[in-house]
Design a protein with these regions (language model features):
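Conserved catalytic cysteine-centered active-site region
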Residues: 23-27, 31-43, 71-124
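Short acidic capping loops at alpha-helix termini that bridge into adjacent secondary structure
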Residues: 59-65, 92-94, 122-124, 228-233
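Phosphate/pyrophosphate-binding loops at sites that engage ATP/ADP/AMP, CoA/4′-phosphopantetheine
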Residues: 48-63, 217-231
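Condensing-enzyme catalytic core mediating Claisen C-C bond formation in acyl metabolism
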Residues: 1-38, 140-208, 212, 216
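Short beta-strand segments
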Residues: 69, 99, 124-130, 156, ...
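Conserved small/polar residues in nucleotide/adenosyl-binding loops
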Residues: 235-242
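Flexible, glycine-rich active-site loops centered on histidine and acidic residues
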Residues: 117-151
């Protein structure tokens, strides 16, 4: 993993919006977040990737697939995975990005699992990286207390004791509950200039959706794999972590 050095505490945020350390901690469990001052999304992704490669004890040229999950790429194109490829020297890898916000890494991992299971690729580098500080409205208390910048990476290969089961769902009808507008909304023919889109969230709706749907997904994957909740350690469950309450 990799996080930038700059720390923004809850007390720092209390100088920007009407909030305080106790309010944030009691509702989210968050005490501080990291904010990038010099790193780009691909910089953070590459630094996390380099650490994962080193820990895996492999040569970067052994990697034949790179999947980067991000909602804040450096460019529209080339994709961020290609930038990571160049920075870590994984010259033999096919590269693409996945945009799925909070669930991005889970979707990227499941995609790598499918490719490796099919035999098409052998060694995948899966990365989740976001520079959300540039998408957050720092005057919006409902979002600015929740998000920061950072990256995590994993080297994925086939193994007998690997992924036991997957359960993926989407509900596009709820997309407006947590969203960030496109920054290419201008139209030169109509004289409309692009507007900066910032993240917006209906917190209660997100909470209600998560507490209902996530347990159902867990139940489904347990049934599909012939397991029970009692038999599975939480350390073997990979899901999006939102806050201490969720």
């Amino acid at each position: 993993s990799y996080v930038p050095a700059q720390i923004v505490t809850n007390d720092d945020l209390s100088k920007i919006v009407e909030t305080n350390d106790q309010w944030i901690r009691s509702r989210t469990g968050i005490g501080e977040r990291r904010i990038a001052t010099d790193d780009s999304t691909s910089d953070m992704a590459a630094k996390a990737a380099a650490r994962a490669i080193e820990q895996a004890g492999i040569d970067p040229e052994e990697i034949d697939l790179i999947i980067l999950a991000t909602s804040s790429p450096d460019y529209c194109f080339p994709n961020g995975a290609c930038e990571v490829q160049a920075k870590v020297g994984a010259v033999n890898a096919a590269c693409f990005d996945i945009s799925s916000a909070c669930t991005g890494f889970v979707f990227a991992l499941s995609t790598a699992h499918a490719y490796i299971s099919s035999g098409l690729y052998k060694t995948a580098l899966v990365i989740g990286a976001d520079l959300l500080s540039k998408l957050v409205d720092w005057t919006d208390r409902s979002t600015c207390v929740l998000f920061g910048d950072g990256a995590g990476a994993a080297v994925v290969t086939a193994a007998e004791n690997g992924i036991i089961g997957l359960n993926m769902h989407s509900n596009g009808a709820k997309g407006g509950v947590l969203t960030c507008g496109s920054r290419s909304t201008g139209n030169f023919l109509l004289g409309k200039k692009p507007e900066l889109g910032y993240m917006t969230m209906e917190g209660q709706e997100v909470f209600k959706f998560a507490v209902k749907q996530v347990p159902e997904c867990i139940k489904e994957v347990l049934e599909e794999t012939g397991n029970t909740a009692e038999a599975v350690s939480y350390t073997h469950l990979r899901a999006h972590e939102t806050s201490q309450d969720l």
